[in-house]
Amino acid sequence: MKALVALGITLILACSEVFFPFIWRGKDLFGGKTEKSHVLSIVEESKVMVDNAIYKTMARNLKKREANSPAQLLSFSKLPEPTSRAVSQAAEVMETAIQAVKRKVYLKPKQSRHPTDVLSEDLLNTIANISGCLPYMLPPKCPNTCLANKYRLITGACNNRDHPRWGAANTALARWLPPAYEDGISQPRGWSHDFLYNGFPLPPVRELTRQVIQVSNEAVTEDDQYSDLLMVWGQYIDHDIAFTPQSTSKAAFWGGIDCQLTCENQNPCFPIQQLPFNDSLTAGTDCLPFYRSSAACGTGHQGAFFGNLSESNPRQQMNGLTSFLDASTVYGSSPALEKQLRNWTSEEGLLRVNRRYQNEGRAYLPFVARRSPCAQEPGADGADRIECFLAGDGRASEALSLTAVHTLWLREHNRLAVALKALNPHWSADTVYQEARKIVGALHQIITMRDYIPKILGPEAFQEYVGLYEGYDATVDPTVSNVFSTAAFRFGHATVHPLVRRLDDGFQEHPDLPRLHLHDVFFSPWRLIREGGLDPLVRGLLARPAKLQVQHQLMNEGLTEKLFVLSNSGTLDLASLNLQRGRDHGLPGYNEWREFCSLPRLETQADLNTAINNRSVAEKIMNLYKHPDNIDVWLGGLAENFLPRARTGPLFACIIGKQMKALRDGDRFWWENRHIFTEAQRRELEKHSLSRIICDNTGLTRVPIDAFQVGQFPQDFESCENIPHINLEAWRETFHQDKVENGDFVHCEEAGKRALVYSCHHGYELQGQEQITCTDKGWDFPPPVCKDINECKDLMDPPCHLSAECKNIKGSFQCLCTDPYMLGEDERTCVDSGRLPKASFVSITLGGVLIGGLAALTWLVICRWTRSDTESALATTDREREITSQLGCGKCQEMKISQQSISTQGTDKDFASGSQTLLCK
């Protein structure tokens, strides 16, 4: 009996455990509301919260019309393009919503600590969809035509057919080691002041800058082998493969406080604390603003929505660019940006150029469409602003040297496009564009892997980590890694020279263009346009050395004390930003990465001295960190002894080498892949060089054979006539391509069969099959046709700004402005022309005529009225005479002499009086 009672009690408890949560789950979990309605309301509230924070940020930026602070300039340079911004915003909505859900769930006693244990799968999918993240987490739909093997997609998607998101824009950076977040999921290293690492707190990043990293501008050592162009190329290529967007909001999501006004860690605010004394950088403030990088959708705390809130799904950061070496610096990484950059009116597949300015007949980059924070020439008229430049990467205006390289490639694309069109007149504008883009991408790969990376790694490390190309490997993930982007490839910051040198035709200091301090060229495109153009700057990059990375001279004070300084409104410290970014991303410590690269761990001061032979620097690092495991990977790798004939130590050589091999071997469109170019084309591509690019796109007539090798002019320079160049005859098509009305087709082969892939000219859409294949019975489908698109009806993505009127024309559209406005640089936005409207001149003329007419009419009326009054008075006098003469005769006769006498006297008086009156009138 007792056994039966015990069994019954057990069954009752089991049933209650199973059924009661099921019964109450819909009500009690959220205080009487249904699960779905309450959770959805939380998501909507979170969406409003994030939107409000972003709105406050935008409103603050719009009000800011004077000189921008360094923090605002950094935010501008980190501003993602619209697609990346949408992904970031969706992730932030999810991040904020899950925090709210956690609070509700965790406050309930005896509830599971994971929302996934109490939220249904359908509801989780609904939440993900409402936040906006779900579409960006699904695999992209890859095109199924043979063109998919001919040209890479602008987004980088579908490069790997089995893993279409590998290397694509707006996907998470790769993790080669698990992150080291303080909570295991999302919280940065150093977030909690009480959190200890091996018994010690992490040192403040600003203190590391001041004691270990910074050197005065006058104390830098110059590199005796490599030119300043080596440094610039590294920065340029970094911007081709990696861009981590900051939070879209500059205000805390909870409470909405401005991140520039708080020194507390409130997501997305992660401020850099100032030193307690003697810190010139932060005089008058307690901290420097810093914003966390956006999380990739579905990672970190957002993982709760996808059933994976755990340390196995930590917060990941997003790469807004394609990972591939594909010249996205020239063409962008999204269809929207690519559309802005192209010249759609040209039949030669050109890129847009600046419409207002030229450099001795050569093109400049176009300006951005709206007012930008770039500096203006002192004393310049506000009506003649020089905005930031528009390029494939938004950081093109950060520094003049970087702008110069962007400009060279704009010119090179257009040069190639014109030549290719001349060789193949039957090619459509899009075919010319794609072929020129393909060549430019290949040249980026060649210059980087053949000329740049071996100098950085040294020949031995290059052979060990990169080696010879053996063909495309579909099992290799080319995605840029977090440690490469956030730490290793930032070694180049230690090679930035504090001076910008501009040279004359003889490669001497220019008499009219003195050297500039680094902080004088930040966000200053006006200097390129107003001060001599591209050539003096390029001469300086070729003939002047880079800064040498020395252990006790790691970074010049132009970067640590005056980063992005355009006014007296503060500054930033690049070294501190790098260290804080590594902690934000949860990068494991220095020793973890040494172990990853099969290098020995450093456990003692003596061990550290072997990796860093400058004992003073090694001791400072140990005194600050207290333990080698605590050392931030960026600083540890930066301070290591160089490998032989290299510009990095063993750790960074390993990380950079592994990444470059992955970018090469995991890229289906790598230039050496025999399916991408013909053998003849590959031979021609190998001849080209950065020196040749400079010869073809500047006024320079002599250059070094190797543009990265510093030399003396003229003995180390070669005539451009002797610099090898591409013979584009290898791209001539020998067969005729028939014309297609308002479109074109491209020949290609698929499974050994001839195929035609059709495309329409810009402004037309395809109706029918995009690809037709030649079979035994003829073409498998009839050819498609191209129909005009009415772009003006596109309400989701209107072609013209709201300030302009859209007019559809055949194959295109026109944006029309009302006088006195005119089309801006983007040809879509109306801007003030600075003059009176034409209608104003007509109005003034008509007004003058009208006023003159009214004055004349008034004068005429007055004169006519005066004349009429005079004539009336004369008529009255005559009438009086007549009346007098016609008075009754009887009366006159009765009066006779007496009346006659009186009458005669009176008449004399009246005439006298009348004459006097007429005279007065």
How would you label these PLM feature ranges?
Residues 841-867:
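Single-pass type I membrane-protein transmembrane alpha-helix
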Residues 797-800, 809-810:
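Repeat-scaffold signature, strongest for collagen triple-helical Gly-X-Y repeats
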Residues 737-742, 766, 772-798, 819-837:
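N-terminal entry motif of extracellular EGF-like repeats
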Residues 2-400, 418, 423-743, 853-858, ...:
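Terminal regions of secretory-pathway proteins
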Residues 12, 17, 837-848:
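Alpha-helical transmembrane segments in eukaryotic/viral proteins
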Residues 867-875:
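Interhelical loop segments of eukaryotic multi-pass membrane proteins
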